[in-house]
Amino acid sequence: MQTAAKLSALSLSLQKFSYRFAEQVLNSKLATKEEIEQVLLEPVPDIAKLSRPAFNELLLQRFVNRGWKSQPAVFDDPADPGARMDFLKERVGIEVGFGHASFIGIDLLKFQVASYSALDKIDVGVYVVTTGNFQKVMKSVLSQNWEGSLTFEKVKRYLPHFKSAIQVPIYVVGIDVQLVPTRPA
């Protein structure tokens, strides 16, 4: 087993899946799309300490610093349920799905509700998750347990089954990682 000390770097990359033409919608807001991808690919100060809560906190700081509204309510009426998206800017809603895989339905419904009826807050949702490979590397190389978290592969597999319930375009972004070995001295 490799350790973080034996690596020169862990390189982040993104896998993407466009549901209901989400990428085309985001391309009409190209600066916003590029900003999201830049935030997700920005180097992590210490990837060895990148637990789920630490990664959530890092993304919170990065998005808020770029003007994204944090934890906007899905419903406007205070008497309505307290559902919240993670981030909102320029009619793009972001949900970070680093939690348990069982939250997929709740997360997707937030996008649907925020896009329809009187709410009409978003044109597209961006669902940020990690890949199965990311979770495997984090556990085997860095001893960070991401087991049980939702994966990009699962969202990509499940989302088409929700086609009658989820009408809003959703851009699924899977954060992946590659090991970059050190060169012998």
What residue ranges belong to the model's regions?
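Conserved beta-strand signature within the Rossmann-like core of class I S-adenosyl-L-methionine
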Residues: 120-131
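Short, flexible loop/turn elements at secondary-structure junctions
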Residues: 91, 98-100, 176
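Domain-level recognition of nuclease-like catalytic cores that cleave nucleotide substrates
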Residues: 131-185
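Active-site beta-strand-loop-beta-strand hairpin of nuclease catalytic cores
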Residues: 83-93, 118
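Active-site-adjacent loop/helix micro-motif of nuclease/hydrolase catalytic cores
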Residues: 96-110
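Short, well-ordered amphipathic alpha-helices
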Residues: 108-115, 156
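Arginine/glycine-rich "motif VI" loop of SF2 helicases in the C-terminal RecA-like domain
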Residues: 114-121, 161-165
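Acidic-basic catalytic patches of nuclease active cores, encompassing PD-(D/E)XK
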Residues: 1-77
